[in-house]
Structure formats: structure tokens, C-alpha cells
């Protein structure tokens, strides 16, 4: 009873802070909306008002404008028609990877004793590019998060392209649309370990391969390196979430809303139910729909208006990207449950709570190769806190990083979005290219934590060149800079984990038998085919007999095309209207995100304050013991001077031994 006033005070303080922050978010959203509407008016209608000639000509230009709009409309719908046919053709072909480069299959894990739907490809260098087989090979792991593989080699200016141009052999880990029956994420981890061993066999005279992991492929690469540290070289993880509860509660115009979605939906039970409705298979289109929901302005207006406004030049680029974006892949129920329960909600990757197929727990401190972390302040799917906070959780201090002989390099982009980290040609030419060029320098760095700075130097011919500088940083300074609220905003996620576990058990006991009884392969296929993201594609394709007139009409329009320039007065008014819609949708998104954030902390923040905060305080009451101060460690340090070479070699061998396993002779 004596704790009730203290608990009540905590909840009052929390509710006040949440209310203040919500008001701040909404006020900021309103200010941005007003500013954008004002700018759009000034740049378009305002400019017309200052030009009497253009203003007077508006009435005479309507005919030309309507002709242009009609022609653009036909070409716009023809592009969507082509997208639908491209979607169907891609499906019939089995959704091959969207790689820009030719390739050959080295290993197909569907033929393994424990089959999984993964394969290892060797990228064939394009004409004029020479590869040195003795140079360090690269292994790129693409994300399996709803879309298909290939985004790491989507264009010439890509991670694959910059490594090839630097003379490195490049291998690519892909996956197929349908998972093998019963495969798990731990099976995938073992398979990727086999792939890396195969690459080492193919390049016996080369240094250990670089492992490049994009987004989900990043934490997969870290699991791979922790399970098999003797075969992996430097690890580069791009936009990869590692600390899943992290975010910037008090910083920025709007927070990272994706981290709240699991809690607001009640935890992991929903992914289980969706899988059960699909006969034990999870449809990746639901993940893609979540991504699209993060930016409704782009999803519902911007990308289509950009195509409409530039329909004479834009279709090729639009269709190229849509081929990847519209390729939806599947997971086993066991896989998505493992991801949601152990990572997104459980947050167990950094804590050593994940057990490999071998039976031992994965410890990220076992990784001995340098680690390069690339994140962006503009990424609202993997914010920098999720990319970097695990370092503090795993190592605790700068001294421990050094004591364990680890090199960790952080590279932070200021504004590129999540997809831009992998797709942007500018990012590939600058950040990814420089990462490739300096990996030898990274390996030569003494143990510690470093920031990587890339400085642009303009040359006389106009082509930029780059210089890289490594600045040693202290973990104790970096983490507070990223987490202004001292990570207190992560505490409510402990309540989310508890509620999620309860809801998961309740679903499995009371609802799952009924859901599974209603599901079969036919209902699962119907649900996938009529998913909104698929239906909007095949509905505008050859499958629709009412659209047979569209292609001939588009051909006729092209022969009689009368385009207006973007500076035409009515085109300017059109652009203003588009910006009004765009700004309004962004305002809706910002307010929606603010409401999600406030609801999350009102619910789970209060739950943590009332039921879990006191228990945690008791657990933290005993201060942590510095490992070097333990009596057994002090005794060992005192005896270091005893003995000769044999004793020293024995001690080194004992220290290099991992989890009681014999030390390989190569080490």
C-alpha cells in the first residue's frame, strides 16, 4: 500500500510528458502543413499572379491543357497496365532475383539434406570489368522481409557494382518465393554458414570473405558471424535493426512509428493468426503493406503523380522498381513467429538469448572480425538507435570493446531513407564505394569504436573524389548522443513483451484450433491472390478483358502527342494541387504517428510504471561487478609472468577456445 502514492506519481508524470509531447508533435505537423501550402501557392499560383501575360492566357490555354491531360492519362494507365502484365510474367517465371548482373548458381540449398529455399550465386562481372580471384570475396545477403532478393545489386551503381569494379569476386545469397516445408531461421543460418565455407573453398588464397547484410540480412549476417566466427571476415551491415526497442522519443518532428506497431496490435499473435489463415504460410505482402503505410503520401499519391506528370520519360524507371516492389515472397509460420517473438518483441539477439542449431547460445562478443555499421538519420524503419544501441548492450564500455580486441566502425548518413541505403546510386558511389576501399584500413585499426567520416573533394573536371577519416569515439559519449532520453523510453517494451506472451498463449489455446480448421490450401491461395497489393496489379492487366482497348489507344496517342512544358501556367496550378494533396497526406501521417506514440506510452508506459518498475529497481539495486575485479581474474593476472613460451601459448589457446569447443589449428 505504501507504494501506491509513488506509482500514482510516476503515472501522472508520464501522462503529463506524453500529453506535452503529443501537443508538440501536432503543433509541429500543423506548422509544416501551413508552410508547405504557403510555399506551393507562392511558387505556382503566386508566380502566375505576378505575370499578367500568363494570367490573361489561362483562358486560351485550356484546350491545349485538356489535350495534354487526356494524353497523359492514357499513357499513365497504359504504364499501370504494363505493370500488371509485368507482375503476372514475373509470377509465372517464379519471381527470379531482380539483379542487374548476370549470375550462375553455386549452391542450391533446396537440395541439401535439410533443405531451405536459399541459394548462393556467383555474380558474373560485366564486360570490361576484371576480377582478381585472389582478392577478398564479397558475400551479399539481401533482406527477406516481404520482397524478393536483388536490391543489393539492383543497378550498376550498387553494392555489387562497386565491389566488382574494385576487382573483388562477388557472391549473392538469394531466396526463392516458397519456403521449404518445416524450414526455420536457424536452418537458414546454418545454410548461410555452408555458403561462406564454400566461398572460402573457391578462394583458398584470399582473405576471409566480407559479409554484407542489408536490413534483415544484417542481423542474419551477425547471427552467421556469431555462430561461425572463424570463417567470416569483416561484416558490413546496412540499415539493419539490432536493438529492436530503440528509437528517438523526444527528438525529431515525428518518431519512429514502426517500433510501436507490435505493441498496439497486442504483440506477436497477429502474425500467427495471419499464418494460420494462410495454411501455415505467412504472406510477405503484409510486411510490404506495413512499409507502405509509413508514407501514405508516396504510396497513394506521389509515386503515381510523378509518373503522370512525367509520363513521357518516367515509365521505364517506374516499371523497373515496381518489378522488385511487387514481388511478394512467403515465409513459414515458424519463421515469422521466430522473428517476431525473438527479435521484434523479444529483443533477444544482443542478449545472448538465441540458441543455434548446435545447441549453444549465440554471443555477439564471439565475433572477432571488424564490424561496420551504416545507418541513416532519415531512416524511419531502422533508426540509428536500433542500428547502434546493441553495441552498448553487448559491450557496456569502450574498455570492454578494446579488451575483447574488437573494431567497430559507425557511418551515419544524415537524410537518406531506408530504401535509399540500398537503392540510391549516389549512396552506392559514395558510402558503399568508400566502405569497399577502406576495409583494409579498418582491419588495421587498433581495437576500439570509430566514426567514419567521408569528405567530398571537388576535382577540376567536376567529378567528386572522397577522402575517409576514422575518428576514435567513446561508447559512453556516442550512446547518450543518440538517446537523449537515456533509453527510458525503451522500458515500456518490457510490458509489451509480457502482454505479447499472454496474448500469444491465449490465441494458441482459444482461437488457433478454429482458425486452422477454417484454413486450407485453396483458401490460402485465394487470400494471397486477393491481397490488395496483388489485386491492384493483376486487375489492370491482360486478365481484365475490359482493358483490351488501352494499348492500341496509347499507341495512337504517342503518334499524336502534344505535351505541355512543366512551366505552362496550368501545369503549375496542377503541381500546386498535387503539393496540397501531398502535404495533407503527410499531415495525416504525422498526426497518426503522434496518436500511435501517445497511445503506446499511455498504455504500456503506465503498465510498466504500475506493475514492473519496482521489480526492475530491485534487480538493479546490486551494482554490476567489473570483471577484472573478480578474485579469479585477479589471481590469473597475477600469474601471467610465470612460465615460458609453452605456458604462454597454452594460455592463449585457452583464451581463444570458445564454449569448450576445440580450437581449430588455423587459429
Say what each PLM segment does.
Residues 134, 143-207, 520, 558-559, ...:
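Active-site catalytic motif of lipid deacylating hydrolases and related acyltransferases
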Amino acid at each position: 500500500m505504501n507504494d501506491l502514492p509513488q506509482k500514482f506519481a510516476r503515472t501522472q508524470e508520464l501522462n503529463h510528458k506524453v500529453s506535452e509531447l503529443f501537443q508538440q508533435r501536432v503543433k509541429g505537423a500543423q506548422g509544416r502543413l501551413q508552410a508547405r501550402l504557403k510555399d506551393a501557392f507562392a511558387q505556382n499560383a503566386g508566380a502566375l499572379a505576378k505575370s499578367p501575360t500568363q494570367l490573361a492566357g489561362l483562358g486560351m490555354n485550356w484546350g491545349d491543357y485538356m489535350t495534354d491531360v487526356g494524353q497523359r492519362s492514357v499513357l499513365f494507365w497504359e504504364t499501370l497496365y504494363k505493370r500488371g502484365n509485368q507482375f503476372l510474367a514475373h509470377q509465372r517465371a517464379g519471381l527470379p532475383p531482380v539483379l542487374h548482373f548476370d549470375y550462375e548458381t553455386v549452391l542450391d540449398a533446396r537440395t541439401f539434406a535439410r533443405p531451405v529455399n536459399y541459394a548462393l550465386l556467383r555474380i558474373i562481372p560485366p564486360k570490361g570489368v576484371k576480377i582478381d580471384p585472389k582478392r577478398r570475396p564479397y558475400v551479399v545477403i539481401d533482406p527477406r522481409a516481404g520482397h524478393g532478393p536483388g536490391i543489393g545489386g539492383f543497378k550498376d551503381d550498387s553494392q555489387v557494382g562497386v565491389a566488382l569494379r574494385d576487382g573483388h569476386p562477388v557472391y549473392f545469397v538469394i531466396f526463392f518465393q516458397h519456403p521449404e516445408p518445416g524450414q526455420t531461421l536457424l536452418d537458414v543460418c546454418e545454410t548461410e554458414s555452408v555458403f561462406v565455407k564454400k566461398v572460402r573453398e573457391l578462394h583458398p588464397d584470399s582473405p576471409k570473405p566480407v559479409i554484407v547484410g542489408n536490413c534483415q540480412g544484417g542481423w542474419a549476417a551477425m547471427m552467421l558471424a556469431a555462430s561461425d566466427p572463424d570463417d567470416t571476415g569483416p561484416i558490413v551491415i546496412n540499415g539493419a535493426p539490432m536493438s529492436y526497442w530503440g528509437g528517438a522519443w523526444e527528438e525529431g518532428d515525428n518518431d519512429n512509428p514502426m517500433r510501436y506497431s507490435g505493441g498496439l496490435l497486442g504483440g506477436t499473435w497477429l502474425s500467427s493468426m495471419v499464418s494460420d489463415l494462410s495454411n501455415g504460410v505467412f504472406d510477405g505482402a503484409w510486411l510490404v503493406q506495413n512499409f507502405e503505410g509509413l508514407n501514405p503520401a508516396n504510396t497513394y499519391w506521389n509515386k503515381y503523380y510523378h509518373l503522370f506528370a512525367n509520363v513521357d520519360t518516367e515509365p521505364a524507371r517506374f516499371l523497373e522498381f515496381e518489378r522488385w516492389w511487387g514481388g511478394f515472397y512467403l515465409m513459414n509460420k515458424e519463421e515469422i513467429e521466430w522473428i517476431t517473438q525473438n527479435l521484434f518483441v523479444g529483443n533477444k539477439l544482443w542478449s545472448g538469448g538465441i540458441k543455434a542449431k548446435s545447441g549453444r547460445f549465440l554471443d555477439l562478443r564471439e565475433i572477432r572480425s571488424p564490424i561496420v555499421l551504416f545507418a541513416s538519420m532519415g531512416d524511419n524503419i531502422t533508426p540509428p538507435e536500433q542500428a547502434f544501441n546493441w553495441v552498448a548492450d553487448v559491450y557496456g564500455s569502450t574498455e570492454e570493446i578494446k579488451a575483447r580486441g574488437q573494431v567497430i566502425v559507425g557511418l551515419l548518413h544524415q537524410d537518406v531513407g531506408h530504401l535509399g541505403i540500398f537503392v540510391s546510386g549516389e549512396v552506392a558511389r559514395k558510402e558503399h564505394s568508400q566502405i569497399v576501399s577502406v576495409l583494409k584500413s579498418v582491419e588495421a585499426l587498433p581495437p576500439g569504436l570509430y566514426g567514419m567520416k567521408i569528405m567530398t573533394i571537388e576535382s577540376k573536371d567536376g567529378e567528386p573524389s572522397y577522402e575517409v577519416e576514422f575518428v576514435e569515439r567513446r561508447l559512453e559519449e556516442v550512446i547518450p548522443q543518440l538517446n537523449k532520453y537515456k533509453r527510458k523510453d525503451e522500458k515500456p517494451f518490457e510490458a509489451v513483451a509480457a502482454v505479447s506472451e499472454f496474448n500469444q498463449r491465449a490465441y494458441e489455446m482459444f482461437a488457433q484450433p478454429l482458425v486452422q480448421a477454417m484454413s486450407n490450401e485453396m483458401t490460402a491461395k485465394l487470400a494471397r491472390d486477393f491481397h490488395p497489393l496483388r489485386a491492384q496489379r493483376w486487375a489492370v492487366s491482360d486478365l481484365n478483358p475490359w482493358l483490351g482497348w488501352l494499348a492500341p489507344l496509347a499507341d495512337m496517342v504517342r503518334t499524336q502527342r502534344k505535351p505541355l512544358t512543366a512551366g505552362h501556367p496550368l501545369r503549375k496550378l496542377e503541381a500546386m494541387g498535387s503539393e496540397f494533396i501531398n502535404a495533407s497526406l503527410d499531415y495525416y501521417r504525422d498526426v497518426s504517428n503522434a496518436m500511435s506514440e501517445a497511445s503506446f506510452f499511455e498504455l504500456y508506459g503506465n503498465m510498466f510504471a504500475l506493475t514492473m518498475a519496482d521489480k526492475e529497481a530491485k534487480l538493479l539495486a546490486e551494482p554490476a561487478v567489473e570483471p577484472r575485479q573478480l578474485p579469479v581474474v585477479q589471481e590469473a593476472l597475477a600469474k601471467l609472468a610465470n612460465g615460458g613460451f609453452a605456458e604462454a601459448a597454452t594460455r592463449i589457446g585457452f583464451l581463444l577456445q570458445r564454449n569448450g569447443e576445440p580450437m581449430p589449428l588455423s587459429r
